[in-house]
Every structure is written in C-alpha cells, then in structure tokens.
C-alpha cells in the first residue's frame, strides 16, 4: 500500500469534517474606503513624461475615451466611499428623534389627517343637505366621533333658534359683516389709543429736548452778571457797562462760538453797534483785505 492510499484511508476514517477554506476580504466595511480625492491620477501616454508641459494629443479619440473612463471611475469610487460612510453610521442613527420640535410628529400628522377627513365629511353632509334640513327638521350632530342624541340635538337647535330670534334673525351675510364691523371698529379704537399714546410720548420728548437745549444755550447776560458778582461790582451792572463788556468780550473771542452771541446782544442793545470797527462786518472786511494782500504778487 502506497503512502497516498494510507493518507486517503486516514482522511476517510477521520470523524472531523475538514474546514472549508474561504477567501477573506482584505478591507472591512467598518473601516471605510479611501477618499477619491487621495487617489493618484495616472495620465495617458499622450501627456508624455510627468512634470513636463502637457503635450498636444494627436489622437483626440484616445483623450476622450480616457476622460470618460476617469469620470466613470471617479463616480464609482465616490459612490462606494459615500456608501461606506453611510454603512458606518447607519447602526448609530436614533430610531426616535430627541429634538423637542420633532416629538410627537407622527401623532400630530395623524390628528391633522383625521381632522381633515372630518371636515371633508362634514362638507359632504352639508352639500347633500343632511346637516341642516330646515326649521323643525331632525339634525344629526357628531361630537368626538360620537353621535349626539336626538334630545341633545333638539336642545341645541332650540338654543340656536332662541339666540337668532334675539338677534332679529339675521342672515349669514349680515352676521359675517356685523362681526367684521365690530372687529374693524375695535381695531380702529385700539389704533387711535396707541396713536394718542405715541403723540403724548412725542410731546413729552420734544419738551424735554427743548428744556435741555434751553439749559445748554449760552446767555451772555448770565455770564456778565456772574462775573460782576465774583468781582464784587454788583452795583455797576447796567446797560452801558454791559455794552462795554460785550465789546471787550468780542475783541477777546473772535474765533470762538460765543462771538455770535455777543454780537446779537450788542445789536439788540444798540442798532448802531455794527458801525463800530469791532463789529462782525468790519472784522470780516479786514480779514478779506488781509488775504487779498497775501494773494497779491510780491514786487
């Protein structure tokens, strides 16, 4: 007996079944695929050596075929890459959303669809004439998917008829317009009330601003009286002395914001004050002469 026969016999007498050798995948789906952006592009031979300027292709068909092949390859790789990303996160997606804005959305959708169907059924009944068949007729009323008893329906009809009699049995159009008129009058009254409030607030703001401007307004007479009191010359306070004080201050404050205030007070006291050499007109004229002399060519 040969060695091969011995090996076969031992294999047959062995109770354990030999293991089946299967090909194992090198990559795991949980590990994911390499991003297509990291793939190295192999250019066709028409480009020449890598690093040299692009050569002009003599065969345009070869170039188009290569572009189409690369496009399909990129599309397949992107699809495989994105699919692997989805497989990795698919098991971790929450079955129920934790967002407070999405809680109970299924129940909300069911309630909406149910209410919509109830409204459609009610409209069908109204159109078919089953809801309100006239005075004294039987009325079928459903509330929360339950039929109201005939006694309750008659009581409801009697209550409605009593309210209509008190209102003078108005038509549907009159009731609609009356409600609109009441709402419009209410809205106009509210708008008028808000308008009066805005008016009062605006007047109070304007008064406060005027008072602030008056407080901030410069008054030469107040400065004159304060200065004379500090010097102890309260008895000399008068119109003639005030004129001299204004002329002195005008001479000292030719380039300040107080100059105009001094000028106006002096004009109110003496109409002939502007004939003085210290007046604003004479000062402006002297400044103009000065600049005119400066512009003249030097001899």
From Swiss-Prot:
Localization per Swiss-Prot or TrEMBL: Cytoplasm, Perinuclear region
Region called Disordered, residue ranges: 1-38
Protein's UniProt keywords contain Cytoplasm: yes
Effect of deleting the gene: Worms fail to complete meiosis, form a weak eggshell, fail to orient properly the first mitotic spindle and fail to undergo cytokinesis.
Source species, domain of life: Eukaryota
Tissue: Expressed in mature sperm.
A GO biological process held by the record: prevention of polyspermy
Main localization category: cytoplasm
Keyword entries, A-Z: Cytoplasm, Developmental protein, Differentiation, Spermatogenesis
Gene Ontology terms: cellular component: nucleus; perinuclear region of cytoplasm
Keyword Cytoplasm on entry: yes
Role according to the record: Paternally sperm-supplied factor required for embryogenesis. Plays a role in preventing polyspermy possibly by promoting the formation of a continuous and cohesive eggshell chitin layer.
UniProt name for this protein: Spermatocyte protein spe-11
Phylogenetic lineage: Eukaryota, Metazoa, Ecdysozoa, Nematoda, Chromadorea
């Amino acid at each position: 007996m040969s060695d091969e026969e011995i090996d076969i016999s031992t294999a047959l007498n062995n109770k354990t079944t030999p293991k089946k050798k299967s090909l194992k995948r090198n990559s795991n789906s949980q590990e994911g695929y390499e991003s297509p952006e990291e793939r190295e592009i192999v250019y066709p031979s028409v480009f020449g050596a890598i690093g040299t300027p692009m050569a002009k292709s003599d065969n345009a068909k070869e170039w188009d075929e290569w572009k189409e092949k690369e496009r399909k390859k990129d599309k397949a790789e992107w699809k495989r890459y994105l699919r692997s990303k989805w497989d990795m996160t698919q098991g971790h997606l929450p079955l129920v959303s934790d967002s407070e804005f999405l809680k109970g959305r299924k129940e909300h959708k069911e309630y909406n669809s149910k209410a919509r169907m109830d409204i459609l059924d009610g409209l069908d009944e109204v159109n078919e004439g089953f809801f309100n068949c006239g005075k004294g007729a039987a009325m079928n009323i459903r509330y929360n998917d339950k039929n109201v008893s005939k006694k309750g329906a008659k009581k409801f009809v009697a209550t409605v008829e009593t309210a209509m009699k008190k209102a003078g049995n108005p038509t549907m159009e009159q009731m609609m317009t009356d409600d609109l008129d009441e709402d419009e009058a209410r809205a106009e009254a509210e708008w008028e009330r808000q308008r009066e409030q805005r008016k009062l607030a605006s007047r109070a703001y304007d008064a406060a601003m005027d008072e602030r401007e008056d407080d901030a307004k410069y008054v030469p007479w107040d400065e004159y009286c304060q200065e004379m009191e500090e010097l102890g010359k309260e008895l000399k306070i008068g119109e003639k002395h005030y004129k001299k004080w204004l002329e002195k201050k005008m001479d000292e404050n030719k380039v300040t914001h107080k100059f105009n205030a001094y000028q106006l007070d002096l004009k109110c006291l003496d109409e002939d004050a502007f004939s003085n050499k210290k007046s604003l007109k004479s000062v402006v004229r002297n400044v103009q002469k000065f600049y005119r002399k400066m512009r003249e060519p030097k001899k």
